[in-house]
Amino acid sequence: MQVDKEILRALNQVLGQALIAINQYFLHARIAKNWALSELNEKLYHQSIHEMKWADDLIERILMLDGLPNLQELGKILIGENVAEILRCDLQLEYQKTDIIKNAIALCEQQRDFVSRKLLVKLKDGSEEHIDWLETQIELVTSMGIENYTQSLLDS
């Protein structure tokens, strides 16, 4: 199935964001595990796996459209050096990723590619859910203080 090159470029941009997220969340999960923050480790590890599944869906869609998935275009990974920074870095990534997804959705609507649009809406919804979780965690850090927040995440 042939499709507009702009759609393929947009899908590859979203794929690039998913690849960044896989690596960033995985590294942050392992940092949290090293700090004995099992709850944060588990959440970020599962988010990394979700991103991997979304990347797989994007790869399949790009291939279906006779495109070539670009797995080499990795952007900058934002690594936090403490819990608050980890949350802020992940939130920044999600904001950036969501903006790129929204632009891709608009392009799909313009080009009448509703199958790609449906996939992208699913990814956007997942990103917005994660944004809500991250914003809540940052609010908890602010209201509880970083020490109490971190203590609440420690292994029992």
Descriptions of predicted regions:
Residues M1-S156:
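Iron-associated oxidoreductase/ferritin-like identity signal
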